[in-house]
């Protein structure tokens, strides 16, 4: 999730019928009744529900319903934090009456000790966590958007206390990429093709994306600070990141490894001995 500080919407405590920070209807180009409009309206209603409960402190929107509202589209869902008084979080996770008061729920399940994934009857999807103030202070999350907060809520809930991931070292990422290829090809030759596919067409590709970003070859920054592959098709043109050549499927590990190695060699220095080993392994795996 990337951040846009200018779109943060500060809020103060409402009376139960109003929710400051509401942005429904403000997404440029959105259509009434569209998924973006419905998601924002859902969160506005949720803020109003929480405002009537004495133990809720804030509702924080994340990702495309947070500070990156420009990313909202028909395929978006709602990621959010509900911040509550210390000791109240267990009841919020166990009993979703507050969520059902917002919109009818078709299905949900506990996906962590702190939250759930939920499908609403109207087809909207959401993932959320319920955190106490103490828990929020140790949580890693991107800068958020305050949809609603109580009058006595501490300042700065939308900014994480835990430092965001730092900038990785280029040399380290290159080393990880080529060793992912090396290990993956050995596993392919052993017959462990699924794990080989993950090493070559998953982990090594992630490292390549990081490398290209460090070299400034992308348009804009990383979309999601915690998920490297989000939005890469918009960020890198095919001549820079040839995904069709390096993500070719279960039967194409040798071909993908060679293609990825060639991309690396165009942009960074690869240890010659390791490059030779990778090519030799790919030749064996491709036969």
Locations of the language-model features?
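Conserved NTP/Mg2+-binding pocket subregion across the NTase superfamily
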Residues: 2, 98-195, 199, 203
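Long, compositionally biased low-complexity repeat segments characteristic
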Residues: 4-20
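Metal-dependent nucleotidyltransferase catalytic core
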Residues: 33-54, 62-75, 81-129
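Short aromatic-enriched loop/helix-cap "lid" or pocket-rim segments at secondary-structure transitions
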Residues: 71-74, 140-141, 223-225
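Generic secondary-structure boundary/loop-capping signal
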Residues: 96, 143-145, 229, 233
């Amino acid at each position: 999730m990337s951040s846009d500080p200018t779109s943060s919407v500060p809020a103060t405590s409402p009376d139960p019928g109003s929710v400051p920070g509401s942005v429904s209807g403000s997404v440029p180009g959105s259509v009434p009744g569209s998924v973006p409009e419905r998601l924002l309206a859902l969160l506005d209603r949720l803020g109003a529900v929480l405002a009537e409960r004495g133990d809720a402190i804030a509702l924080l929107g994340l990702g495309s319903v947070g500070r990156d509202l420009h990313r909202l589209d028909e395929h978006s869902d709602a990621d959010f934090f509900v911040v509550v008084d210390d000791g109240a979080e267990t009841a919020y996770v166990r009993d979703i009456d507050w969520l059902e008061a917002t919109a009818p729920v078709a299905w949900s399940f506990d996906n962590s000790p702190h939250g759930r994934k939920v499908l609403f009857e109207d087809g909207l999807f959401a993932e959320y966590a319920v955190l106490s103030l103490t828990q929020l202070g140790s949580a890693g999350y991107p800068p958020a958007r305050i949809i609603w907060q109580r009058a006595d809520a501490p300042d700065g809930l939308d900014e994480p206390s835990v430092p965001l991931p730092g900038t990785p070292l280029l040399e380290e990422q290159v080393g990880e990429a080529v060793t992912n290829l090396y290990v993956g090809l050995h596993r392919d030759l052993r017959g462990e093709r699924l794990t080989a596919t993950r090493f070559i067409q998953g982990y090594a590709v992630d490292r390549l994306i990081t490398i290209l970003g460090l070299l400034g070859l992308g348009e804009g920054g990383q979309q999601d600070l915690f998920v490297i592959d989000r939005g890469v098709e918009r960020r890198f043109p095919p001549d820079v990141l040839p995904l069709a050549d390096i993500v070719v499927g279960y039967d194409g590990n040798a071909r993908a490894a060679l293609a990825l190695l060639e991309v690396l060699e165009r942009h960074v220095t690869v240890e010659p001995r390791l490059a030779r080993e990778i090519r030799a392994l790919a030749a064996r795996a491709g036969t």
